[in-house]
Regions:
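SF2 helicase/translocase NTPase motor core
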Residues: 4-46, 67, 80, 91-213
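Walker A/P-loop
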Residues: 66-86
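Active-site signature of alpha/beta-hydrolase-fold catalytic machinery across serine-
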Residues: 56, 85, 89
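N-terminal pre-P-loop "Q-motif" helix
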Residues: 44-67
């Protein structure tokens, strides 16, 4: 992507990546290819060098330090593919990752990013109500996934278990904001979050006094 790092962060960024490579005893490219079950060629097709570094350090943080990671790249660097790669990683490791974003139209964006990295087969369970704005569309505008009908959706919320037909979860922050008056969705997300991977898009907009994220 031919990106640059601010001078004030360049040394620290380089050292952080180098420390991870020393700890894992391999370079980040090899490490990420192994964790995402890619050949070296397919990894290069799916992720740029910058994205590989981000994914590698995120996976290292999860597996070794039991911590998360914040991706603070500017627009155009490809944070969506990093998020998609982490969803792929979670699914490959027996989890049902939870993707949370600010607006439902971003469900389509994450699906397209998953498509770009060769993971369009991963099936989302949409927490939001079934309506046109929550539909997931491919690059041609065709609807490929929709939220379940309300009766089936509510059944899943109540049993707090994801059926085998789904691989990961999509929700907006607004679905988590009514835990007092409408607790069923927040309770479901809370139950599903245990020992799981959360991918929080636009997470800086999830905090504050607003109840809508």
């Amino acid at each position: 992507l031919d990106t640059v790092v601010p001078d004030s962060m360049g040394y620290e960024t380089h050292i952080a990546a180098r420390i991870v490579e020393i700890k894992i005893n391999k370079d980040l490219h090899e490490y990420v290819a192994e964790k995402l079950k890619y050949s070296s060629f397919d990894l290069c097709k799916s992720l740029s060098a910058e994205q590989v570094d981000a994914v590698g350090m995120a996976i290292y943080n999860i597996e070794v330090k039991k911590q998360g990671m914040i991706i603070g790249d500017q627009t155009g660097i490809g944070k969506g593919r990093v998020a998609a790669a982490m969803i792929r990683y979670g699914c490959l490791n027996g989890m049902h990752p939870i993707f949370i974003s600010e607006k439902p139209n971003l469900f389509t964006d994450i699906y397209r990013d998953l498509t770009d990295i060769g993971s369009s087969d991963l099936r989302p369970f949409i927490v939001n109500a079934k309506e046109s704005k929550t539909d997931i569309k491919d690059f041609d505008g065709n609807i490929v996934y929709q939220a379940p009908d309300k009766v089936y959706q509510d059944t899943i919320f109540k049993i707090k278990k994801l059926p085998a037909e789904y691989d990961f979860i999509c929700s907006t922050y607004s679905q988590l904001s009514s835990s007092d008056t409408k607790p069923i969705k927040p309770a479901f997300i809370l139950a599903m979050a245990k020992d799981n991977l959360l991918v929080m898009d636009e997470s800086h907009n999830a905090s504050g006094s607003s109840k809508t994220g």
